[in-house]
Amino acid sequence: MKKTIKFLAIASSFAFLANVANADTFIRMVSGPSGGSWYPLGAKIMQTFQSKIKGTATSNTSGGGISNVMSVDGGDAEFGFTYAHTVANGYNGKGKFKKARKNVRYFATLYPAAFQVAVPKNSKIKGFEDMKAANISPGKPKWTGTAFCESILKDYGFNFDTIKKNGGVVHMVSYKESVALMKDGQADVFMAATSVPQASFIELENSPGIRFIGLPKDRIDRIVKNNPGYIYGKIPASAYKSLDKDIPTLGIVTSAIVNKDLPNDLVYNMTK
């Protein structure tokens, strides 16, 4: 059985290399982290491009909303997922971008996403004001969810440095690692800007059990006003079994981007 599996793996590798060797065009995609919705969606899109666009080979690697804009702009990828406000900030050199990313072009608006925040079900943390000395897991650097967290903490009058000075920890890790930290009791808060529902939160609902934290309307009003591209969002009660009411939060729009140097006819075929 092991020999059969090994043979199939080798055969698949040769088949992929053959596709690349025979391809006229190679589309490299940067999507999202393992455990999130972007990675499997990106894999499916790349599979579709390769099967439907003649002479095309594709690849899909993990990434994040901010880093994906940098990768596509820098020519390390031709296609990527991000958020509408993130690509706008990147193009104009604002927010987390130290320089304008002018090689990026908007490809498509996909679907809304929400900023989701969860704590263990028996946690004493009721809101962001209780996180000043907590162990939080907001995502990796250059991820949009991490930037979301920073925007919210700023409105509450503190930041990551405050948490660290107070004895807390800011875990800059992946969804998978965040789930492990929550299960082991090493993280008090898990945050992610992603689709609803999301697999990592569903897993944590089952074990050890979680409670979602929302934002007061006045906070959402102010943060949306101060951060163009942020929108009003919610986690519907129907999304997770532990919810009995909607959770008000911030929202964003998931988008796809391409490098400006892609041929027009190729981009047109990709849209189809």
Name each region found by the language model:
Residues 263-270:
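Short amphipathic alpha-helical coupling segments at ligand-binding clamshell hinges
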